[in-house]
């Protein structure tokens, strides 16, 4: 049985479409490889940015801990300063010639208790179970912050020597000034680190969203369209082949 020219033309039409679909599929495969190559590089950069951002974020958390240490130390020094003021008052009273020995003894007893209270304030000032009046190193966003807060000696304090109290109060003032400067420096570091973290995350999102996600989604959409066309062509070709086979029987 002869196959009509129209049938042959229809067969060639579907075969040509199938071939074109196959060629397009190959082009898309090459495109996938190209996209994968680019996005692999972008992923590596994005991973690096994510790691950098995580490191910065942890540094910021460490910096906040450092500020917490300094704030607790400053609060303790505020109480100690008040105690030192009271010692200074007692020292002035001790110079009152009208006081008898019993009254002076009472002043010395109060001074001793205040001195013990000052020592307790130094010893009991803790952050997360650690005494804040020591040297601590904190790895923060831009390096290492060191808090060097050594407790002041109180052995030389005496209400019989106002100079000893004045000297102690001067040391307290210097220590509190260092704490204030430290808090300001760490706060500035935190602000810069947070901005760096935001920039890193924005760069990471741009890499993933603009390159990988968009390109891959575009490819997938086109690839599905081509596969659908190829599938239709293949199905039509199979139907033609079936008809030809039936005609040849």
Curated annotation (Swiss-Prot):
From the UniProt record, list the coiled-coil ranges.
none
The terms under GO molecular function for this entry are: structural molecule activity
Knockout or disruption consequences: No visible effect on flagellar structure, cell shape or motility. Adheres to host epithelial cells (human HEp2) but invades less well (14% suriving bacteria, determined by bacterial counts from lysed cells after 2 hours of gentamicin treatment).
Principal location listed in the UniProt entry: secreted
- GO CC list: bacterial-type flagellum; extracellular region; host cell surface
Task: Output the InterPro entries linked to this UniProt entry.
Answer: Flagellin (IPR001492), Flagellin_N (IPR001029)
Where is this protein localized, as stated in its record? Secreted; Host cell surface
The record's section on SUPFAM superfamilies has: Phase 1 flagellin
What does the PTM comment state?
The secreted form is about 1 kDa larger than the whole cell lysate form, presumably due to post-translational modification. A 22 kDa form is also found in the secreted fraction, probably resulting from proteolysis.
* Record's keyword terms, sorted: Secreted, Virulence
Q: What does this protein do?
A: Plays a role in virulence.
Which protein, by its recorded name, is this?
Secreted flagellin C
The record's gene field reads flaC
